[in-house]
C-alpha cells in the first residue's frame, strides 16, 4: 500500500504547490521532467519583455506624411493577431484615425501581411518579407532601420504597389525580473538560449540586458522547432518558454513546454505542458526546484516503503511479528509516505 501511495501522493502535493504559486501542470510527467532541464530556451516577446510593445517612431518616405503612413499600416494590421500589429492598431485608434477596409488579406507567419486597400496593394512586415515580394529598400530606409535596431526596437516596413513608403518602430519593456531569473538558472547549472523572430541586433540588445549569451534571431516558427531539435541532439533536456502562436510548434517539440498563461495565445497554452497563470517568469527557477524536490520525495518514499516491507517480511518469517502487529507496521508505512510528501507543502525552494 505504501509503495503504491509513494508516487501519486507526492505528485498530488507537487501539483498543489504549483497551483498555489500560479503554475499549472497538465501531466505528472511534466512535473517530473522539468527538474531534468539543462537548457531553457526563451522567446523574446513575453518571457523577456512585457509583451506590450508601443509605437515609438514613425518614419515616412518622401511625399507621405506620418498620419498617411500610419493609416496604411492601420488598415493592414486591423485583422492581424500579432502583438506588433495590435500595438499599431491601438496607437492609431488612440489618434482617432479612420479605418479603411482591407480585402484579400493574407498573412505569412513570422514575416508579414498583405492586403488590398482602396485598390492599392499593400504590404506590411520585415525587411526580408518585402524583399521576397520584390520591394527594394532604399538607402534612407536601410539607414533608419539600422539606427532603430541598435536601440533594440522592432521595425515594420510598409509598401504600396511595390514601393516602400516608410518604417514604423515599436519598443517593448524589459521584464524587471528577467535578468535575475537568468542568473538563478545559471547558478543552477542551466544554460539559457534566446529564440526570436526579431532581427539579430534587436535580439542581441535584449539578450545583453538579461545576460543571455546564446542568441538565435530572424527565426520563423519552423526554425524555432529546428533549433529546439538541434539543442536536444546534444543529449540535453530542453525547456521552451513562449506565449505566441508562433511558439506553439517549438513548445510541442521541447522536452517541456511552458506557456505564459494569462497573456499567451490559446494555441500556445494548448501546446504547452505547463502554464504560468500569473505570467511571472521568476517562477522558472522555482519550477525546476519544485520538480527536483518532488522526484526526490518520490524516491525517498519508495525506498522507505520497500525497507519497511522488507523488514516486516523478515520479522514475520522469524516469528517476531504476528498478524496484528504486521498490519500496524503496514499502515505505519503508508502514514510515513504521506507525511514525507506533506513536507513539500509551503517550502520556498530558495
Where are the language model's segments positioned?
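Membrane-embedded transport module
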Residues: 272, 277-350
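Conserved S/T- and glycine-rich ATP-binding loop of Class I adenylate-forming
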Residues: 1, 46, 185, 333
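Re-entrant/interfacial helical elements at transmembrane boundaries that shape
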Residues: 6-16, 54-57, 87-94, 270-271, ...
Amino acid at each position: 500500500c505504501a509503495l503504491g501511495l509513494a508516487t501519486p501522493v507526492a505528485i498530488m502535493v507537487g501539483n498543489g504547490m504549483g497551483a498555489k504559486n500560479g503554475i499549472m501542470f497538465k501531466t505528472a510527467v511534466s512535473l517530473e521532467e522539468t527538474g531534468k532541464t539543462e537548457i531553457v530556451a526563451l522567446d523574446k516577446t513575453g518571457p523577456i519583455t512585457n509583451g506590450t510593445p508601443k509605437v515609438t517612431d514613425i518614419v515616412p518616405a518622401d511625399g507621405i506624411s506620418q498620419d498617411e503612413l500610419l493609416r496604411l499600416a492601420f488598415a493592414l494590421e486591423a485583422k492581424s493577431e500579432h502583438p506588433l500589429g495590435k500595438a499599431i492598431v491601438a496607437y492609431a485608434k488612440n489618434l482617432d484615425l479612420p479605418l479603411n477596409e482591407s480585402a484579400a488579406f493574407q498573412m505569412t507567419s513570422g514575416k508579414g501581411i498583405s492586403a488590398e486597400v482602396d485598390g492599392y496593394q499593400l504590404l506590411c512586415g520585415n525587411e526580408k518579407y518585402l524583399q521576397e515580394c520584390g520591394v527594394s529598400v532604399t538607402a534612407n530606409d536601410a539607414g533608419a532601420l539600422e539606427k532603430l535596431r541598435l536601440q533594440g526596437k522592432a521595425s515594420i516596413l510598409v509598401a504600396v504597389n511595390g514601393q516602400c513608403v516608410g518604417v514604423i518602430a515599436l519598443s517593448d519593456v524589459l521584464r524587471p525580473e528577467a535578468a535575475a531569473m537568468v542568473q538563478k538558472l545559471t547558478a543552477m547549472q542551466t544554460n539559457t538560449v534566446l529564440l526570436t523572430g526579431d532581427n539579430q541586433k534587436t535580439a542581441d540588445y535584449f539578450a545583453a540586458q538579461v545576460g543571455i549569451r546564446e542568441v538565435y534571431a530572424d527565426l520563423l516558427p519552423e526554425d524555432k522547432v529546428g533549433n529546439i531539435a538541434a539543442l536536444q541532439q546534444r543529449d540535453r533536456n530542453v525547456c521552451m518558454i513562449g506565449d505566441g502562436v508562433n511558439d506553439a510548434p517549438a513548445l510541442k517539440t521541447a522536452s517541456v513546454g511552458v506557456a505564459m498563461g494569462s497573456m499567451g495565445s490559446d494555441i500556445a497554452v494548448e501546446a504547452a505542458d505547463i502554464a504560468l497563470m500569473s505570467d511571472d517568469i521568476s517562477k522558472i527557477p522555482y519550477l525546476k526546484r519544485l520538480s527536483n524536490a518532488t522526484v526526490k520525495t518520490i524516491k525517498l518514499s519508495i525506498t522507505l516503503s520497500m525497507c519497511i516491507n522488507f523488514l516486516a517480511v523478515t520479522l514475520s518469517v522469524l516469528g517476531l511479528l504476528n498478524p496484528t502487529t504486521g498490519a500496524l507496521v503496514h499502515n505505519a508505512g503508508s502514514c510515513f509516505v504521506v507525511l514525507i510528501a506533506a513536507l513539500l507543502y509551503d517550502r520556498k525552494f530558495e
